[in-house]
Structure formats: structure tokens, C-alpha cells
């Protein structure tokens, strides 16, 4: 029994040591998390588990569109049941939930413009981009047509259309998507950011910006989220805005954060690595296991 216990503690220490090493390496910049694939082998760029990542994106995008378009559909039919603020909160919360649920699997992009931006700035392999786009548009389309069925006889399923001049809506979409991508790059690609709060940060950015963008452009920030309900509702007014705006916004947001980002001195980076909640927890457990063996 004692031997088995010792073996168990030894295996536990080995596992924790490996996790600490991996996390430290990730935060030091040598290896980066799901969203970042620098120069790697074909097996890393085109992994055997790509299918699971694609399914994760389908599910995450489905739920994103189902919640956001569902809330918008009900608001459009009867604004006494769901308010404009309620729509924004629902959108921000579903983004937060999906990041925590699927971020460790696929990166929880849920947005073709985000995937494109990550690929352009070497945070995602180009070879996987078409698969992610297919997953995102598939999930969005499925959600839109499911909503069309369950919300019948509502004819317009959460479409986003300009409420005024098209250039107003375009400018709003660029600005709000810039904000979302700037925050996303900060928490997803920078080792100094508190990664555990990524979901809250990105979800809050989506919620805050959509509160004022909603009355002007609908606050889409996502080509898949706009195209799917447009097809289901047969409403294509200003559709180009919701492709061009998010693409410009995400690319500019990622570029600006990449430009202002800088690397700290090694000593400072070492201190920053120890601020990770997960790393501290692992190190505490490792120390406790070592104490038990003394």
C-alpha cells in the first residue's frame, strides 16, 4: 500500500512538473497556446485532432448565433419581452461562456474575421483557415434555420441591417470590431495578460460595444452571424457592410496591439509567469507532494 501511494505521488509530481514546464514555456513565448502556431511541423499545423476542433467551432458558433439572433428576433417582434440592453448582455454572455467551454479545444474563434486576423498575424495556421470558416458558417446557418423553425411565424430572424446611411453602419462596425479584436489579441496572444480572464474580457468588450452599436448597425462584428439570418430571412440589405467592416476592424485591432506590444526583460518575465493562477496552484501541489514524501 505504501509503495502504491509513493508511486501515485511520484506520478502526480511528474504530471504536475510536466504541466508547469509546459505552462512556463508557453508564457515565456517559446510555445504559445491554441491560437498561435509559429514555425512547426506539418503534424502540428495540420493535427490529427483538427476534426474535433472543427466540431468545436460548429457547436460554439451555433450557440452564439442561436442566442444572439434569438434574442434579436424576439426583441424585433416585441421589445417588451427583451430590451436592447438584454440583447447586448445575451451576446456578451454567450461569448464568455463559449470561450470558457471551447477555448481550450479550438480557440473559440466563432468568427471568420477573427480567424482571418489571427492567421494574418501568425497566430493561426493558414492551412486550417478554410476548415474554421466552413465550421463557422455551417454552425451559423444551422442556428438560423433552427430559429426560423422554432420562432415561426416570426419572419425576420435577427438580421443586422443599417438604420441610417451605410457609411455610418460601416464605421460603427469597424470601430466595435476593432475594440473586440484589440482585447482578444491582448488576452489570447500576450503572455503578460491574465489568460484566465480572457472570456470575461472578450465577452465584456462585445457587450459594451454592442449596446451603442446595436441601434446604428445591429452590432454584428461577425460575418457569419450576419449572413446566416440574412439567408434564413431572405433579407440582404447592406450585407457587404458586415463583411468589410469586421475584416477591417479585426485586422486593424490586431495590428495596433501587435505594434504596441513589447517584450519585458527576462527577470520581469519570470516574475510575471509566477502570477498565473494555474501555475501557482500546480507549484503549491507539487510542494505539498514533496513534503509528504519527506
From Swiss-Prot:
InterPro entries: Aquaporin-like, Aquaporin_transptr, MIP, MIP_CS. It is a multi-pass membrane protein. SUPFAM superfamilies: Aquaporin-like (SSF81338). The keyword Chloroplast does not apply. A motif (NPA 2) lies at residues 222-224. Pfam families: MIP. GO terms for molecular function: channel activity. PROSITE patterns: MIP (PS00221). Its main location: membrane. A motif (NPA 1) lies at residues 111-113. The chain crosses the membrane at residues 54-74, 88-108, 129-151, 169-189, 197-217, 235-255. It is found in: Membrane. One of its GO terms (cellular component) is membrane. Keywords: Membrane, Repeat, Transmembrane, Transmembrane helix, Transport. Belongs to the MIP/aquaporin (TC 1.A.8) family. NIP (TC 1.A.8.12) subfamily. PANTHER family: AQUAPORIN NIP2-1 (PTHR45724), AQUAPORIN NIP2-2 (PTHR45724:SF9). Aquaporins facilitate the transport of water and small neutral solutes across cell membranes. Aquaporins contain two tandem repeats each containing three membrane-spanning domains and a pore-forming loop with the signature motif Asn-Pro-Ala (NPA). This is Aquaporin NIP2-2. It comes from Zea mays. The lineage of its organism: Eukaryota, Viridiplantae, Streptophyta, Embryophyta, Tracheophyta.
